[in-house]
Amino acid sequence: MTSQVQLDAGVVTRCRRRVHLEHDPEMRDVDKAPPDPAGEQRKADATEHRRQVSNALARLFGSQLMEIPFGPDIRTADRERVTLAAMQAGTPYIWGPALPRDLTGGRRGGIDLLVKDTTGYVPVLVVRHKTSDPGHGARTSPLSHPLPNGARVDPARKVRPQPRDQLRLAHAQRQLQAAGFAKHGRAMAGVIGMDADVVVWHDLEAPTWPGGRTALAEYDARFSDRLAVAGAAARGDEPLARPSRIVECKSCPWWPTCDVELKRTRDVSLVARGEDAIALRRAGVSTVDQLAEQTVGEPLIPLVGMPFDDAVILARAWLRDLTVVRRSERMTVPRADVEVDVDMESFADLGAYMWGCWLSGENVDEEPGYRAFATWDPVPSDDEARSFAEFWTWLTAVRLRARARGLSFRAYCYNELAENRWLLGSAERFKGMPGIPPVAQVREFIKSDAWVDLFGIVREEFLCAHGKGLKTIAPVAGFTWRDPEAGGENSMRWYRDAVGMDGNPPDDDQRRRLLEYNEDDVRATHALRNWMSSEEIKLLPFAGDL
C-alpha cells in the first residue's frame, strides 16, 4: 500500500507538532517566523564544507566518483532517476544522490555519499561538526578508502555519538533496503566530520541507545510515529500532535503559530516544558493555572527538569508576570578582595578567539576595568595560543599579587561549561608552546574556590520564569547591553566579518563591536554579582510569599 505522505530524514528529530503543521493543508498560507540569520549561516557553512569534501573525493577517485546534478532548475524526480541508474551501473562512489522514494514506507530524501561495497551500497554523511573525541575505540577508515571493510579500531579516537547523525543514516539505510541496493549483512554507515580526514563508522544494529535499543530500532519507532502524525494532518483527521513548548521552539518557523495557541490555552508547557509537560498533562494538569493551584510540599508526580515545588512556584510567578523570584530570604554570593570577571568568545567548535576580563576590587598594581586578549587570525590558528597564553599569564599575575598582599581572589564566569572546555582544550591543544600552562594547572584552578560559576549560584538562588540566561537575568539587576543585537548567535556573524572569513577585507568596525559586546558581558556578571550582594535583592519577590 502506498503511503499518502513521503517524509525526509529530518522528521525523526523534529517536533511532532511541527510535522503536523508542515502537512496540514490549511496551514500552507500561515505567516511564519523569518529564517534565523545565524541558522542560515550555519547551513551555508555546512554546504561549503560538503563542497570541500566532494572536491577532495574527486581528487582521490577521479572518474570513479559520479556527482548527481543539483540546482534550482533540476527536478527531484530527475535526480532520483539519475541516482537509480548510477546504482544499477554499480558506480563505485556517488556524490549527492537522491535516493529512490520508498512509496510503501513513506520515505524520501538523499544522503551526501554512497560507497559501493561488494554486495551493495553504504550511506555516508558529511557534517560540519566533530564526530569523535580524543580516546580510542572508534572504527575509522581513511578518506582514501571510505568503506566499512577498510575500517580499523582507531587508537586515537573514540566515537562522539551524535544521535541526529545516526538517525539520518538509518533513514538512508531503510531507503536503500527498500530499493534493493543496501549492502548485505550488518547495517554499517559512515560519517565524515569537520576535520574530514577519516570516516567514522557506526553500527546501526549495535545496542548503543538507551535501553539497549539500536539506532535502526530507535529510528523505526520515531519514523512510524511521525508518519502517523503527518498522515493525520494531510487527511484532516484529528491531530495526533498538539502544541507544547520545547527547547527548539525559539528557532522554529512555526513558533508564532504555536505561541499564540499556547498562550490562549495557558498551556502548562509555558512553565514546565518537554517531558515534564507531558507528565503533568497525564496527571491532569494541563494549564499554568492548574499547576499554580497545586500544593507546595505535596508533589503530585516527580518531574525531570525541576523539583515539583519549583514548578508550582514558577507557575504562580508566571501568572503574576514575574521574571525572577528568589528562593531564600538571605542570599550568599562568594566575594573577594580582588575580583576578575571572565568571558570567552569562540567561533563554533573551531577555536576561542577572545578572553575578556573585568578587574575590580583592591589595588594590585593593575589598571581596573576591561581588557581583552584576542586573536584576529581566523580560528583555528596558532595565534590562539598567543592570546590564551597572554590571558593566562595576566590572570595568574593578578592572583599572585593578591596573595602577596594578603588579599583574597576570585574569578567569575557565567556558565562554566564553555569556559572550562576552552580553558582545558587550549592548554591541551597548545601544550609546549610559550606561556601555555600545564593541563593539570588549569584543572586545579577550575576545581578551586577561586573559580566561581555565577550561573550555578543563579540556579540555586532564583526561580526564573523566562530562563536563566545572562541576557535574561542581568536586566533584572538593572544592566543593559549597549548593542541592541547583542547575543551569541549574532556574534558569530560579526566574527566572520571581523576576520574577513567570507573573502572580504577584515572589518575593523565589527572587531570593535565584538570587543564592546565582550566587555558588556563581563560588566554584566559584575553588575549581577553586586546586585545579588546588595540590599536591593530584598526588593525581589520571595518564593515563600507565593
What residues fall within each predicted segment?
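Metal-dependent nuclease catalytic cores that hydrolyze phosphodiester bonds in DNA/RNA
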Residues: 1-119
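Flexible loop/turn segments at secondary-structure boundaries
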Residues: 2-3, 19, 131-132, 258-259, ...
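Generic amphipathic alpha-helical segments used as scaffolds and interaction surfaces in large
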Residues: 40, 44, 159-163, 236-239, ...
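Short linear loop/turn motifs
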Residues: 72-77, 293-297, 307-308, 484-498
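Conserved DEDDh/DEDDy metal-dependent 3′-5′ exonuclease domain
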Residues: 92-104, 108-134, 142-227, 372-490
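Acidic, Mg2+-coordinating catalytic module of metal-dependent nucleases/exonucleases
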Residues: 165, 171-175, 185-265, 473-546
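C-terminal extensions
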Residues: 258-272, 276-392
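Generic beta-strand/beta-sheet core signal
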Residues: 294, 342, 360, 412-415, ...
